[in-house]
Amino acid sequence: MKIFRHLALMTAVLVPVSMLWGRPVPVRQDTVAAGAGGHDAVGGGCIPVLSLAEEDLAYQAGEHFDFTVHYSWGIINSDVGKASVDLDTMTVDGRKVFHCAVYGKTVSWYDLLFKVREDFQSWFTTDGLVPLRFTRDTREGRYIARNTYNYMRNMPEPHIQADVYSSSSGQRNVELPLDSCTYDLPALFFLARNMDFDAVTPGVRYPMTFAIDDDVYNVYFILLGRETRKIKGLGHVRTIKFAAKLLAGEVFTGEEDMLIWVSDDDNRIPLMFEAPILVGTASGRLSGWSGLKHPFSSLVRSQGRQ
């Protein structure tokens, strides 16, 4: 039955960064400077990004993405989950902010084995992409988890005020550490799309911190280069390829990097990922989109949408 849970978690993994959760291990100081996956150098500070002024961002309110999660292991080779990402704007305390809604679910046949529903909501500033609030509502089989985060930046010691519930541990109110490189997963997803690849050194690991449940975790981004790749349902696309390194945990092996391809155009669309998990390999691909800010100019030969 554990394999079903692994796949369920991968349905959630697809989206915020296309991909960044799944019960990793909390960050330890001795792991931050250690080489991993063949990438030894660690860049200082947060990932380099382009201008975060609203008019310069890679996206706009009204953008929508659909994704499909696929699993392969031996004779098993099937789509197991769907996910969507929507971005809009709203007014909070008199201030215009972005609101991101991320939904993930297992497909109907997989519901019979292990039903999953994921709902992530994030609010962050339109200028600077500063996280303000985050909620999570997760159901994985009989397991339930809910998070509510408020970012307390104006306190003597900035922190995330986290109201966390799980069906296994009950209700908890905790304070999570907060610095300028700490994001919730949807906010990190949108920050990463503004990465300045011209300022990134290939092969160097750039650390970021994300919060989920009652802890914070490190993820490392590694630029690998550019390539034209054929993606099922899309066609041939010019892409920027990079890796995300996560620490080993319940789903990820920690031995290999998750590979991510984004469009090599002004949209920086997340197109595809591949990730080795403890049993088999999971992948995700873009299956639908609308409301792009810029032309999808990296799509050089289209197969039409699935």
Question: Model-found features: residue ranges?
Answer:
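Bacterial N-terminal signal peptides
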Residues: 8-18
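Active-site/ligand-binding surface loops and adjacent short beta/alpha elements
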Residues: 155-212
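Positively charged n-region of N-terminal signal peptides that target proteins for export
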Residues: 1-6
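Acidic, serine/threonine-rich low-complexity disordered tracts
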Residues: 23-153, 196-306
